Amino acid sequence: MMNLPQMPHYCKTDVSGSVLFHADCMEVLPLLYEKSVDYSFTSPPYNRKRNDKYSNFNDINHNWLQLNIDVIDQLLRVTKKHIFYNLQANYYNRNDVYKLIGHFSKNILDIHIWEKSNPMPASGKNITNAVEYFLVLGNESLKSNTTYTKNIITT
């Protein structure tokens, strides 16, 4: 098991020794030691500006870009290998998603595309958003176990 600072109520360890944190990441990440996590995988809120999916969740963040910059900065500090950061560019956050990609261009090893074969239809005559991005960040190059691995996942 990894050596962690004191993590009371929001830290759980399973039988494999893996640690799961159920808390606001900006409360937990500053408590972690540098390079104390092997891999990080997260999907921040999309900032869709509407609440039609979860009854107790408000998906409005007026400074979405800065929030994500702060989170990725902390993840780069604590993660040894790779960070997988799942984003969707939508009508409300599109400009900020592309600014975020530019901001971390030196840390991005690759961008994997998640192509959805049956996405939620767009309203009106708008183009349906059928993809999400996985930004892969880190300092260690990506490797594959085959000679032909694509960076597109289709579901």
Q: Which residues make up each language-model segment?
A:
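Core catalytic lobe of class I
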Residues: M1-T155
